Amino acid sequence: MAFHNRRWNFTFSCCVVVLLLPLVAARPQQPSAATRVHEEYSTFRVENTEWTFNHLAVDHRNGNVYLGAVNRIYKLSPGLDIQVSHQTGPDEDNRNCYPPRIVQPCSEPLTLTNNVNKMLLMDYRENRLLACGSLYQGICKLLRLDDLFKLGEPFHKKEHYLSGVNESGSVFGVIVSYGDASPDKLFVATAVDGRPEYFPTISSRKLTRNSEEDGMFAYVFHDEFVASMIKIPSDTFTVVPDFDIYYVYGFSSGNFVYFLTLQPEMGGGPTTGSSSAGREQVYTSKLVRLCKDDTAFNSYVEVPLGCVKGGVEYRLLQAAYLSKAGTILARSLGIGPDDDILYAVFSKGQKRRPKESSQESALCVFTLKEINERIKDRLQSCYKGEGTLDLAWLKVKDISCSSALLTIDDNFCGLDMNAPLGVSEMVRGIPLFSESKDKMTSVIAYVYKNHSLAFVGTRGGRLKKIRVDGPTYGALQYETIQVVDNGPILRDMAFSSDQHFLYVMSESQLTRVPVEACEQYSSCNECLGSGDPHCGWCVLHSMCTRKEKCERSSEPRRFASNIKQCVRLSVHPNNISVSQYSVMLVLEAHNVPELSAGVNCTFEDLAEMDGLVEGNRITCSSPAEKEVPRIIVDQGDHQIVQLYLKSKETGLAFANTSFVFYNCSVHKSCLSCVGSPYQCHWCKYRHTCTHDPSSCSFQEGRVKQPEECPQLLPADRILVPVNVVKPITLRAKNLPQPQSGQRGYECVLTIQGVEQRVPALRFNSSSVQCQNTSYMYDGMEMSSLPVDLTVIWNGDFSIDNPAQNKVHLYKCDARRESCGLCLKADPLFGCVWCKGENRCSLKQHCSYPQSMWLEHNGINSKCTHPRITKITPLRGPREGGTLVTIRGENLGLEFSEIKDHVKVADVECTPVPEGYIPAEQIVCEMGKAERSQFAGNVQVCVGECRPEFMAKSSKYYYFVIPQLLSLKPSRGPISGGTIVNITGGNLDAGSNVSIMFKDQKCTYQRRGGQWITCRSHASMQGYGNVSVSVYVDKAHIHKDLKFEYVEDPTITKLEPEWSIFSGNTPLTVSGTNLDIIHTPLIRAKYKNLETINICQVLSPTTMQCMAPELPYSISKHKDVPERPDEFGFILDNVQSVLALNNTNFVYYPNPVFEPLSVSGVQELKPGSPIILKGRNFLPPTPGGNGKLNYTVLIGDKPCALTVSDTQLLCESPNLTGRHKVLARVGGIEFSPGVVHITSDSPLSSTAVISIAGAGGLLIFFIVIVLIAYKRKSRESDLTLKRLQMQMDNLESRVALECKEAFAELQTDIHELTSDLDGAGIPFLDYRTYTMRVLFPGIEEHPVLRDLEVPGYRQEQVEKGLKLFGQLINNKVFLLSFIRTLESQRGFSMRDRGNVASLIMTVLQSKLEYATDVLKHLLSDLIDKNLESKNHPKLLLRRTESVAEKMLTNWFTFLLYKFLKECAGEPLFSLFCAIKQQMEKGPIDSITGEARYSLSEDKLIRQQIDYKTLVVNCMHPDNEKSPEVQVKVLNCDTVSQVKEKILDAIYKNVPYSHRPKASDMDLEWRQGRVVRVILQDEDVTTKIEADWKRLNMLSHYQVTDNAVVALVPKQVTAYNSVNNSTVSRTSASKYENMIKYTGSPDSLRSRTPMITPDLESGVKVWHLVKNHEHGDQKEGDRGSKMVSEIYLTRLLATKGTLQKFVDDLFETIFSTAHRGSALPLAIKYMFDFLDEQADKHNIHDPHVRHTWKSNCLPLRFWVNVIKNPQFVFDIHKSSITDACLSVVAQTFMDSCSTSEHRLGKDSPSNKLLYAKDIPSYKSWVERYYSDISKMPAISDQDMNAYLAEQSRMHMNEFNTMSSLSEIYSYIGKYTEEIVSALEQDDGARKQRLAYKLEQVVAFMSLES
């Protein structure tokens, strides 16, 4: 027994060892790394938000770019790839340390200080870079250009300190070369920041060859009295404390060096700083000139510069650039093309520094020649002794010029007299271009082909391209590009070395922009009309490009550079009817090149035909009949089609013209037919419009002119009273006489939507009459109703009605309840007031005699008993002038009747004609009343003052005396806007009130009995008191009231300068005169939306405000700070504080709270702290001192808080029970859940009894188990003895099986790869593919069809769904909706997947928005996963949330193209290889087991004898075609054979397009006459015991090379012999078979499909009897080998398929494969996951690796590998499915980071690929690494890609149906969703709950 056990163990171990042996196979080559594609728009972004960019320099020799930033200097390639980074800071420093601490110790406190780059210059001579910073008083580094190696950093002399100012735009340097003989000099100019004793403002320095030499940066000349520098005198700071000179630009030209400056004015203007009391400093822009060789700076001259355009002065210099003039501009300026010109950008006015200046700006140009001439004139006049030196900042006192006899030429460099010198008169530049909204901030220019081109950057981040042709020709802005999303473009811009690109810089990014983008223009006119001189039209290539890029551009007319050279095309005829075909057309082409290669004529995508070229004339035909487009009625009577000429040389269309196909039959009326611009004729008797007049029935029936059309003529108003029988006679012309068989005329009146047909009589061709009838309309709301009238004949032939004649039905008694209203009606109506009936009616309807009528203009036409119903106002001043409005009945029909007959309180009241409404209203103006008159009623007489014509009011009118008491406030800003409240008495009297502040109105707003409010205007008289007057009608109310205009308030400081997106954080505002504003408001504007919040004034200099929220819903869900576009205050009408230009106010992301737990309830013990988790709890403010005011309530009790960035620690109050937790901060209120505080308690007696009982049961159970174990042991011993007897029989068969497996391993690879051909891959279309992934198993989903609702509800439902669609597109709503659903217990996993898929179908057309929502949900999911203490690796492992399914769907949408172009091919090859390899051996059709398998579960574990046959099959569609040879097995069932035959015949046909095997019969043809139908089961089927075996080919004894055919399934009995010559008494066993009615589907699913016959109890089997049946005989089992012996076949199959698995894995895990680049979606999502990991400080590479694996490979690729039917139109059998599952498991193991320890007990599918998985893992790791190294995808590029994907597939799903499906969840959880929206602050502000309730109302509406 022991011996047999050892033999068994040895045998089993051998098989396992075979599985673990490595395969002898060639290793796949490693894929090459992805090659980076350089796009034209390259961008280099800041590495750290604090390291903003300052300066830029480009090496014109090699194109390398050098970038000066805060704390860094970078060397970049021309394509902006970083090459070297050099650190310059930060370091410990204090700006008051002089000399700096690196020279000697400093007593000032040191802080870590950033180093701002202030100057970056290329020293070409010494191949080094000068980089000067703000640290240590402005020392400079000299860096080697090649590698930024520090050559020197002189810092120990005072000359080495340029300036301690840390503003990057305040210093400028110019290196001047003097040739090889002399060293270069550095001219440097800098602001000094109030420390002139340390730093000269301008100086010239030495540049030594040795970068470490002491003399580096020494002054060129320096002695006791003279030096090469100028300092600002200290006296200047006495006059202007904040004086400084800011240097904007510098350059050298000729013998001079020039600097452009901005400096405060000394005289005349108010001062700045603390002495200014809020006044604004006036600045002047000046140019400074120095001689290059002047060591004493005697040549220093400065001249003011400015620009005036349209009467507006532009004086604040922003940027400048020196360039050559160029031919065209030079001609306009009167200078040479190589002369220097200076471009300068100025902003409007002279107040404020450039950063705070006006948005209005101008680009101007100066000629250096004119500037130098002006300087020379000034020098000459000064040296004649004229005037003063005019340099107030340098010479505080005016110094007169000294006279000297000398000649001053163009190169005069001054003497030690009359120097330095200023020019007082401004040099005016020539304005070229102005901008009022987006301030220009930078400029650069160059000359291209004689054109001068300026490139201007703006504050809004745009680049403007301007062609400058001078004052004669003007300037043209021909293109604008948005380069930077936020922030201005900085002054420094530079061209690439070849001038093809421009480097544009902001604080956060450097971008390389092409100087031209010709390819954006798609037509010649656009191209040459754009104004870009770079661009021309390459004619035959039909593209806009530079000339050098156009092939053969030098040949005549191949390249157009002028718009007149564009190809022009005309065609004759230029229109034809849609019913004309193959008409010859003649095209004339102008400006075409030689066309010897030939042309085609193309009618868009409708037709194409050859053209015959004869010179510039081309002849071609119009489309043939089948190609002519059919014109739809809704599209009008014509369709314009573009007719193109296509060059046969290039294959491109190069010219086009419009061609019209017209369709006369569209016209349904004569006038529209003959009025058509095309050749349309009207057939009068056929009532049709045609292009062929010969088709009309009669010659006289043809109409071509409008005058000949049958038509109704204009008629007077046709009045018809209702319910009165009356004919309607109409004038007409050309009325046709109905012919034989045609019907007569009818009138059709459409009354309230209902047609009423009336017979009509044609008197002649010019008259028709609608016969006697009566008409009626519903309702009494309308006194008359215009009704459409149509005259028709012959049933539906309508007569044209060009005058739109209508019938006016009317009712006398509608809306005419009184006599006056009745008589006021239109006299043509014939209405009378029937006094007896006291109503308005027609005369004939009044049953009383005429004496009892009143009618308009009749003998008796005056209504009696007028009545007054209302009077306003009821009070007024005695002085009169009050307009009294009297409403009533019967108040006369003419103004003359009441003109002098109105009295109010016995005072004449003069009626006003403009206010009189006959019978209804009188407006009259009150006269002056006597003092004795106090009150009275209103009296009106109509015509005469007899009682029956007189009306008196029941209410009295009173005379009152208005009075004034006081006004408040009594002072306000000079700009106005103050709401003034005036108190008094009777101030609501009268009809009109006006308030005057001296001679100016105070705009009236509201009033009551004791108050009036008005808004003050800006004062025209200046500061001081003004008298206040009030007028009520003609009464002037006297009171000595004064209002004082005072100086406008100012804002000087704001603390803190930040808030959160939701606002409502307290801000302290400092300023002046704040107490004069009674309702101050603070405002923010962002993305064109404005929000405001309240402020409270505390003192004249202080107020407290609550920050407004950032008014843009998307910003609330961002995780990056945002700056508002405008931030300021609404202080009455003070404009200067409306938008503060000097604030750096920033908004940080809102704090985000997480739920306390998944259930929302957290269990706590008393005294335990409550921890609220989230993020952004501490805004990342500069200095790190940003704190928010949090309030946390437990129930209604606050708790003490400790705050960190991600946690709020709340010391819970002494409470027990359940309490809601509520957190408040800023404008946010959030409840993270409920805490349940429970105290500990000892075990109850019940619990003790329960525990004791459970213990007793456990002991009893253990005893029972021991007894059972003993009995089982005995049975095992007996079984073991039986096994030993079988071992000897099995041993001999092991060797044979292993030998066969090895042979298959060596021979099958070649056979399989040769069988697979490159047939077309049956990809599913996009819609089917996405539906199978989104909604697996659902074939006809509602989202694929139109919404189906009952007709009566359609309109309401569609309205509701449109509103619902708007809500889904609101991010606040959608996120709240998803979160609410996920929090519901009844919301199942299936529901989550369904909702995610439905949302993605709705958002298919808005993938940018869908991506944003997905990122937000994933971010939430990550936060929740980490906070729930789950292991981070579990993230995205399963699909338990909407976000996870949305992620799958997102990849499904975006990877379709990649599947089709790249990954689909190896996946399809693998599927085919598996299918083919499986079918080479037996497959059990019942169990699905196979001889060849990768899955142990689907392996036939016994020896099956089989033989391969070849059958010749007739093609079912064409029996005459050659027979198809098909390999089958003699052990195949009939259904399996049918499937193999169909596979062979329809090899390249998608599975859904080929016949079903179940619809076909297999016919075995024996000779010409005998045909036997084969079946899986028939009367010959063998049944043994209770087992029935399916028929196989061996059962029917089918031989090799047998002829078979697939024929449609017959309805007669199966398996009958078709042999007319065989005797009916034949003994054939196939005769007289009964019809089989239970035939199964012939393995359409190819899964085990035949189940036991339930009626007979017979079990069906094929090759192996199912192991689940326990009645197998012992002998049957004994005939099998030990099943594990056959595991070697797994290895053989694996070896055969290895190449295909490797190909698939290599394709998926390569960043570039088969010519396809990595899909953007993968890079974008992986970067997002990395960002999230960084955010949560997760640096474990295994976690990051696992996140990415769970995100893409395990979520998308595994699904696709296991289910290739999602991608291809194929069928997947159960054995193929099992094999693919093994491949998928291997794929999953390859993505795992954990080590798999394998042994003999491990699953076979793990052992199978154990040796390959380490290699696959390395592929995955390299793949993730390569992706992380690739350049990040910008949001702009990703959004463009997503928009394109949306556009391509935007109509795949029915949005209405999708919305309807989503709405079903609204219906289920309405209350919960509405509640969540009401609790969400953002949703409340947008009233989303209300909008949802509107949707619910529409959707639930029943009628």
Curated annotation (Swiss-Prot):
Annotated signal sequence range: 1-26
Organism: Danio rerio
Membrane topology: Single-pass type I membrane protein
Keyword Membrane attached: yes
CDD domains for the chain: IPT_PCSR, IPT_plexin_repeat1, IPT_plexin_repeat3, RasGAP_plexin_A
Transmembrane stretches, start-end: 1247-1267
UniProt gene name: plxna4
Protein role: Involved in the development of primary sensory neurons especially in branching of the peripheral axons. Interacts with the SLIT2 signaling specifically to promote axonal branching of Rohon-Beard neurons and the trigeminal sensory ganglion neurons.
Glycosylation sites recorded in the entry for this protein: 166, 450, 575, 600, 656, 663, 764, 772, 981, 992, 1025, 1141, 1189, 1214
PANTHER family hit by this protein: PLEXIN, PLEXIN-A4
A Pfam family assignment: Sema
InterPro entries given in the database record: Ig-like_fold (IPR013783), Ig_E-set (IPR014756), IPT_dom (IPR002909), Plexin (IPR031148), Plexin_cytoplasmic_RasGAP_dom (IPR013548), Plexin_RBD (IPR046800), Plexin_repeat (IPR002165), PSI (IPR016201)
UniProtKB keywords: Cell membrane, Developmental protein, Disulfide bond, Glycoprotein, Membrane, Receptor, Repeat, Signal, Transmembrane, Transmembrane helix
Protein name: Plexin-A4
Predominant location category: membrane
Domain PSI: 517-567, 663-710, 811-864
Extracellular side stretches: 27-1246
Cellular component aspect of the GO annotation: membrane; plasma membrane; semaphorin receptor complex
IPT/TIG domain location: 866-960, 962-1046, 1049-1148, 1151-1246
Disulfide linkage: 97-106, 132-140, 291-413, 307-364, 382-401, 518-535, 524-566, 527-544, 538-550, 601-620
Subcellular location: Cell membrane
Cytoplasmic topology ranges: 1268-1903
Family: Belongs to the plexin family.
